[in-house]
Amino acid sequence: MAMIFCSTLFSSPPLLSPLTSTQTKPSRFSKKLRARAQCQSMEDHIHDDLLRRKFMEFPYVSATRKQLMVDLISTVEDRFQPLLLPCSLPPDVRNFKNPNGSAEASIYIRSGEKSSPIDFFIGSWVHGKIPTGVTLNITTISAFLKSSTKAPNFTLEVIQSSPTSLVLILDLPHRTDLVLNPDYLKEYYQDTNLDSYRQSFLKLPGVKPYVSPSLFVRCVVSPAASVLKIDVEEEEQLEEIWRDHVGPAAKEILGVWFERCAREEDDEKRAMGEEERMELERRDKSF
């Protein structure tokens, strides 16, 4: 295709009479360029769709967990579709394996248009064995807002180390100091009753709080975050908790994020000084 394009580009154009208008109708050359551009755009779209399908397979987790991840990603895309740019990561970054095939990962990132409240959202899955011999399967969905708002982001991360054990992080991480901004705490956590999900989880058998060994993780999650260790005896028990409790809660919390956080705010509420905005951007980039 490249050779044909070069041949067309450097071939001699037909001679025109001085009285001939070059703008009466498109030349054969411009039609070919337009056709090639359309074909390339179609090829890019097909290729992007194939890579997206590959990502959406979530091949190393249960069907129940896969369905929730697919549902959440599709919901975000459907909600903001006109305001999201296509994923621009190279194919070898979007899906890759190590040389011996013992580890595989896939990443999917879409940035927001200029008018979108979303800066970007990311989905990923990672499968691999660690030196201790444990096989880890990590799935993540996170959505990050622009610095035009201080509203919380959304995150769901699941770290599974066996068929009957996993760590769950489900949260709307805050983006400002909650002690200095009690109204923020009230609006996004108290008024939304976000802590009720964590409390409900802790009533289930096999579910207990998880304390991350990372001080960084412990300071960035909100007071209402569901940071939990689920450890049960049977695989079916884990599937039941995921299907009947984690899935519905994740969808409801994403709905809260849509309605309370990922929306256009009025100018008065959105107004921030330049120093405050720069501080927010610096904080966001640290993640």
Where do the language-model regions lie?
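Mixed-charge (acidic/basic) macromolecular-recognition segments
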Residues: 169-284
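N-terminal chloroplast transit peptides
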Residues: 1-41
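Charged, compositionally biased non-catalytic regions
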Residues: 31-100
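Phosphate/adenylate-binding glycine loop and adjacent helical scaffold
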Residues: 3, 71-74, 78, 82-189, ...
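Non-membrane alpha-helical secondary structure
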Residues: 43, 47, 61-68, 72, ...
